[in-house]
Amino acid sequence: MKVALTGGGTGGHLSIAKALAIELEKQGVEAIYLGSTYGQDKEWFEDSPLFSECYFFNTQGVVNKSFFKKIGSLFLQAKAALKAKEILKKHQITHTISVGGFSAGPASFASLLNKIPLYIHEQNAIKGSLNRYLSPKAKAVFSSYAFKDKGNHIVTSYPVQNVFFDHARTRTEIKHILFIGGSQGAKAINEFALFNAPKLTKQGIEITHICGPNSYERVRFFYQELGLLDKIVLFAFHNNIIEVMQKADLCVSRAGASSVWELCANGLPTIFIPYPFASNNHQYHNVLEFEKENLCYVVPQNELLPKKLFEVIRKLNQKDEQGHKNLTIISNKLQQKIAKDGAKTIIERILSA
């Protein structure tokens, strides 16, 4: 038995791949990885001990491109699929697991050509274009969201790494706020943090701000101009997100699925600002259920005024009839919403099929 893991491009897809790879290693199953030279795949897995071999193809996404660029991208995908076909055959792969993203294309199509069972994990509440096409052809599609086209879909707990559960805690007071601008550096969140920093620090609330590599110098300059550089903790990027997450009592973040469920597992109440240009507005749909259950606060980017933060803080500090803070109630309920060992459940279902 030998498994090929494929897909990525962004941290959300790659964090799932990592969680599944860790579980495969625990179960003594050898795995290889097939991704792209474009995006973050190499950064995550090029030297990873989780895989016996890693392959990175010259591929790019097709979505949101002009007609001629789409043709070029499809040509690269087809060329890579032929290479992937030979790689899967060479390694005698018995199962292929796709975590989605454009870099999953070549190995997924190669698996179908080689008649290797294909399993898909769909991370978002709205399927990506590749997964929409491949889902009917897959042996099973795993997701933490229930889709209308049930068919071969299996609802499981999100494959969050155990470290997020292990460092979970119930929040009782807002002493520390974490702003996550993401690897791309969300300008709206970065500016939201900068606007609110003077008042927050004046109130004695600590700030950790991950602003993204491309925004680091600009954001650092503005904190310096505000005279706050020595009063906040600023990162361009952080390799160990749980280290900063566990210290925080409130988070401000985009609504990528992996971030949503990692924050949930850690019991960290969050203000989500969904990326408004995400395909099919999937970031908003990722947190829609959470919002309906009063487990988070969702603020559209075009309504992100500085005062929103303090409105949410006031709501979180309010108490119910039993004297429990909303902050604590939400933190407890978040930890109950997601079960541990999502990756283990998925891998066991695949290996026993």
Curated annotation (Swiss-Prot):
Residues that bind UDP-N-acetyl-alpha-D-glucosamine: 10-12, 124, 183, 283
Pathway this chain belongs to: Cell wall biogenesis; peptidoglycan biosynthesis
Superkingdom of source: Bacteria
Membrane topology summary: Peripheral membrane protein
Entry keyword set: Cell cycle, Cell division, Cell inner membrane, Cell membrane, Cell shape, Cell wall biogenesis/degradation, Glycosyltransferase, Membrane, Peptidoglycan synthesis, Transferase
Catalytic activity as recorded in UniProt: di-trans,octa-cis-undecaprenyl diphospho-N-acetyl-alpha-D-muramoyl-L-alanyl-D-glutamyl-meso-2,6-diaminopimeloyl-D-alanyl-D-alanine + UDP-N-acetyl-alpha-D-glucosamine = di-trans,octa-cis-undecaprenyl diphospho-[N-acetyl-alpha-D-glucosaminyl-(1->4)]-N-acetyl-alpha-D-muramoyl-L-alanyl-D-glutamyl-meso-2,6-diaminopimeloyl-D-alanyl-D-alanine + UDP + H(+)
Main location: membrane
GO CC annotations on file: plasma membrane
The EC number(s) this enzyme carries: 2.4.1.227
Any matching Pfam family: Glyco_transf_28
Annotated compartments: Cell inner membrane
MF GO annotations: UDP-N-acetyl-D-glucosamine:N-acetylmuramoyl-L-alanyl-D-glutamyl-meso-2,6-diaminopimelyl-D-alanyl-D-alanine-diphosphoundecaprenol 4-beta-N-acetylglucosaminlytransferase activity; undecaprenyldiphospho-muramoylpentapeptide beta-N-acetylglucosaminyltransferase activity
Record GO biological process: carbohydrate metabolic process; cell division; cell wall organization; lipid glycosylation; peptidoglycan biosynthetic process; regulation of cell shape
InterPro entries attached to this UniProt entry: GlcNAc_MurG (IPR006009), Glyco_trans_28_C (IPR007235), GlycoTrans_28_N (IPR004276)
Role, per record: Cell wall formation. Catalyzes the transfer of a GlcNAc subunit on undecaprenyl-pyrophosphoryl-MurNAc-pentapeptide (lipid intermediate I) to form undecaprenyl-pyrophosphoryl-MurNAc-(pentapeptide)GlcNAc (lipid intermediate II).
Family: Belongs to the glycosyltransferase 28 family. MurG subfamily.
Protein name: UDP-N-acetylglucosamine--N-acetylmuramyl-(pentapeptide) pyrophosphoryl-undecaprenol N-acetylglucosamine transferase
Organism: Helicobacter acinonychis (strain Sheeba)
Gene name of the encoded protein: murG
